[in-house]
Design a protein with these regions (language model features):
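An acidic/histidine-cluster motif and surrounding catalytic segment
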Residues: 1-14, 19-200
Length: 200
């Protein structure tokens, strides 16, 4: 579906069918797609964050992507996305330090998804972004809520991210896209590692 849309359009906003969005979600997505259209290091716009850190402003960058409402550009996807067929193909060129970085030193064991057949697209995109030294824009407060997660196949804890609950209210105040450095924030990354600890 993503490739089909990007054959016809320069950008795409993706929503799963069990997602409820903030009233400011679409404005944020469209503004971010426009603002970073020429900043090719920015590869993904996320609507969900498992953090709640308004003290850091309205947005932040991280190498980690999230689904549940996201966007990207044709050039990023077409130039860099690979749907890997095997674990070996996905991890080609990466060393142990890279694997630890992707999995936040074991707090986010996402690479086990490479053993699935077929390999899910999201871990492929995560690795592609990392290999390109790309970053993903996130709001400091979530703009989406997954209203179907409690009935989902993989749901087994209402606090999958430790103290960061999925069912907290989403932000309704418009996002101001200020000119922040296009790089990860070490303090936020440390918080992210804690928030990802219980998600596998």
């Amino acid at each position: 579906g993503i490739a089909y849309v990007l054959e016809r359009h320069d950008t795409i906003i993706v929503l799963e069918d069990d997602i409820c969005t903030s009233p400011v979600f679409l404005e944020y997505m469209n503004n971010a797609l426009e603002k970073y259209a020429l900043s090719t290091q920015v590869m993904h716009i996320a609507g969900f964050t498992n953090l709640d850190i308004p003290q850091f402003g309205d947005t932040y960058f991280t190498p980690h992507m999230t689904g549940w409402g996201w966007a990207t550009w044709k050039d990023r996807w077409n130039n860099h996305f690979t749907h890997f067929k095997t674990r070996e193909e996905a991890l080609q060129g990466l060393i142990d330090k890279d694997l630890k970085r992707i999995e936040y030193n074991g707090n986010f064991t996402c690479l086990k998804s490479l053993d699935k057949n077929p390999i899910p697209w999201d871990i492929c995109w995560e690795i592609c972004i990392y290999k390109q030294k790309g970053v993903c824009l996130h709001p400091t407060q979530t703009l989406v809520k997954n209203v179907g997660i409690s009935n989902g196949t993989h749901f087994n804890n209402n606090k999958l991210f430790g103290w960061y609950e999925y069912d907290r209210p989403f932000r309704t105040k418009p996002i101001i896209l200020k000119d922040i450095p296009i790089e990860e924030n070490p303090t936020i990354e440390a918080m992210y590692a804690i928030a990802l600890k219980d998600h596998g």
